[in-house]
């Protein structure tokens, strides 16, 4: 099945404490979650690993968000948009449902 949200897509968060924030999708996980750049920052406590020369301490990183809580961002309308699929020249392409423009 083709994915509506893919890596490097610009998305906007629809729900949660980061509602309204925009960012680029850095990773799409197989369990229906995405990691968005600069959104849902968490603090992890990491142990030092002297063998690898890794220091311990508090590390800030992005956590996964469910794909249903983000929507693709349409730069023409400056709003969140829905994604549709259609065939053009024998290829399946994604398009914005608001203005039928190919992504």
From Swiss-Prot:
Q: Which InterPro entries match?
A: KOW, Rib_uL2_dom2, Ribosomal_uL24, Ribosomal_uL24_CS, Ribosomal_uL24_KOW, Translation_prot_SH3-like_sf
Looking up SMART domains in the UniProt record yields: KOW
PROSITE patterns in alphabetical order: RIBOSOMAL_L24
UniProt feature coiled coil, ranges = none
Would you name any one GO CC term?
ribosome
Q: Which residues cross the membrane?
A: none
Keyword annotations from UniProtKB, A to Z:
Ribonucleoprotein, Ribosomal protein, RNA-binding, rRNA-binding
What is stated as this protein's family in its record?
Belongs to the universal ribosomal protein uL24 family.
What protein name applies here? Answer: Large ribosomal subunit protein uL24
Organism whose genome encodes this protein? Mannheimia succiniciproducens (strain KCTC 0769BP / MBEL55E)
């Amino acid at each position: 099945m083709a994915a509506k949200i893919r890596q490097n897509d610009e998305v906007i968060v629809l729900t949660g404490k980061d509602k309204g924030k925009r960012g680029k999708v850095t990773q799409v996980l197989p369990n229906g979650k995405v990691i968005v750049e600069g959104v849902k920052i968490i603090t992890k406590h990491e142990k030092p690993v002297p063998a690898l020369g890794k220091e311990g301490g508090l590390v800030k990183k992005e956590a996964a968000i469910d794909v249903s809580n983000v929507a693709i961002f349409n730069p023409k309308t400056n709003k969140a948009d829905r994604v549709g699929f259609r065939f053009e020249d024998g290829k399946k392409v994604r398009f914005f449902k608001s203005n039928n423009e190919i992504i």
